[in-house]
Amino acid sequence: QLERMERLEAPKNESGVAHISFEAAEESGKEVLQVHDVKLGYDLTHLLAEHVSFDVTKQHIVALVGQNGIGKSTLIKTILGRLPLLGGEIKLGANVSVGYYDQEQATLDPKKTVLNSVWDDHPIMPEKDIRSILGSFLFTGEAVEKNVSALSGGEKARLLLTKLSLEKDNFLILDEPTNHLDIDSREVLETALNEYNGTVFFVSHDRYFINAVATEVLELSPEGTTFYDGDYDYYLEKTRAEQEDYRAKASFETKTVEK
């Protein structure tokens, strides 16, 4: 690891808006993620969902939606191997490298400074380059010397995105990436994901964000998953139509029984 003797000034970002970009260093295979008949939960006595099956294809952006507490974050942690697989199969495709954004921000070390949080991951990168990248994410001047424990939720979110952008993975798994971000940063993140040459699987409650970036929507329920080939508006339109069909069928069956 290089000696860090000289303290350099981080270049100022005059615009006041973070510059976020992602680029995959290597291409993955066409099939990025395959999930087949997975049981979802913390243990077999407390299952959240069963028969979870879906595929994620290269360069698609898939939004995972569902009711609160249904297990969206649990599914992500199971895919990442942070929770045990209770049943079924999860398979990453050829040459897939995963970058993870944790909504709980637990992947950050609270004892490290902003600068060291990034530099420790890339020790051979010159300090001026690290500071320049941090500056583009609005960490300028003395802000890079702050401890992670002293950062706001928004600052931690930007630090996580800084680290993610430097990894150059080809499959980003993002758990509520817009939480804590201001409107300008959200819009920049939308652009960055739309220009990204890799694949994205993300959870969000922000329908505007989903509409701006998702190519497909995956709905998680206790009975499994349903894939919708479109944005959030398309998903709402299709689910509304399905509910109307269900109500019409139920009404018809009730009337038939009454006769």
Task: Report the location of each language-model feature.
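Proline-centered turn/helix-capping motifs that create local helix->coil transitions or kinks
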Residues: 3-14, 247-248
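A generic structural signal for short beta-strands and their flanking turns/coil linkers
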Residues: 16-18
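ABC ATP-binding cassette signature C-motif
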Residues: 20-259
